Amino acid sequence: YKMPFLLSFIDHMDTIGDAKIEDVLTDYIAFYQDRIDKGLPVDRPSCPYNDETLKDRKMIKSSMLTNPFEKFERKRFMYYSKDLGVISLNHALLAKMSEGDWERVKAQMREDLERYYQ
């Protein structure tokens, strides 16, 4: 769950490290829906994501905030403002990242996804 989440977050993150949760959620759902549409495994057999549950944005949002987001929040890499509907990257971490760093992170996530599903 971490790789699709991170890719979605990075794609929607603005210059101050914020991303609207609804935008991240849309891409996160689209990743798994695309796998279902192509007849590919979504994840492990115990994964709750299927054609029906992916239509329930509230459930998927809750799932996404529990795992994988919570893992990043626990390490204080990210935080979520429910009132603003925004997921934010820790500003100290953001300040250390260059555009090249973000490209390397995205490339690594894509490579890891390929390996994960092999």
Region annotations inferred by a language model:
Residues 1-118:
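Intrinsically disordered, charged low-complexity linkers and terminal tails
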